[in-house]
């Protein structure tokens, strides 16, 4: 079941450096200018449900699966289009607004 879809409209200059560390920071297309340099800016269409453990995320050429969801992650996503995906292999729980994922390969972030 699809719970949301979005289109990447801008990739901040520092966003790929974060990806190298296993972190993808999303903000909606209304994000303040000072946050856009390190973020992936996306146009969120509609949200049909919440991100939960087991949710599958298709991101460009990669398939991710949610293993932990921080307690305010869904609220931030719904209200701000803000989502922090951590796609590293650590086993620690997700922090407040984070969503931890396993992946088949690291995503290649592209506009579109």
What are these regions (language model features)?
Residues 28-29, 41-46, 103-105:
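A structural micro-motif recognizing beta-strand termini
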Residues 31, 45-46, 62-65:
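Short, charged beta-turn/beta-strand-edge "cap" motif at the junction between a beta-strand
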Residues 62-63, 70-75:
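Short, conserved beta-turn/loop elements at beta-strand boundaries and strand-helix junctions
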Residues 73-84:
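Short, solvent-exposed secondary-structure boundary/capping segments
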Residues 1-25:
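N-terminal, charge-rich interaction modules
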Residues 49-51, 57-58, 109-111:
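Short, well-ordered loop/turn sites that connect or cap secondary structure elements
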Residues 89-112:
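Helix-rich interaction surfaces within compact, conserved domain-sized segments
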């Amino acid at each position: 079941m699809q719970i949301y879809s979005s289109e990447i409209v801008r990739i901040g200059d520092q966003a790929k450096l974060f990806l190298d560390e296993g972190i993808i920071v999303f903000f909606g297309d209304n994000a303040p200018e000072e946050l856009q340099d390190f973020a992936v800016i996306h146009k969120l269409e509609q949200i049909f449900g919440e991100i939960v453990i087991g949710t599958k995320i298709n991101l460009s050429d990669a398939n991710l699966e949610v293993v932990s969801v921080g307690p305010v992650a869904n609220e931030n996503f719904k209200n701000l289009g803000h989502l922090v995906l951590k796609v590293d292999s650590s086993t620690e729980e997700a922090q407040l607004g984070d969503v931890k994922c396993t992946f088949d390969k690291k995503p290649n972030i592209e506009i579109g």
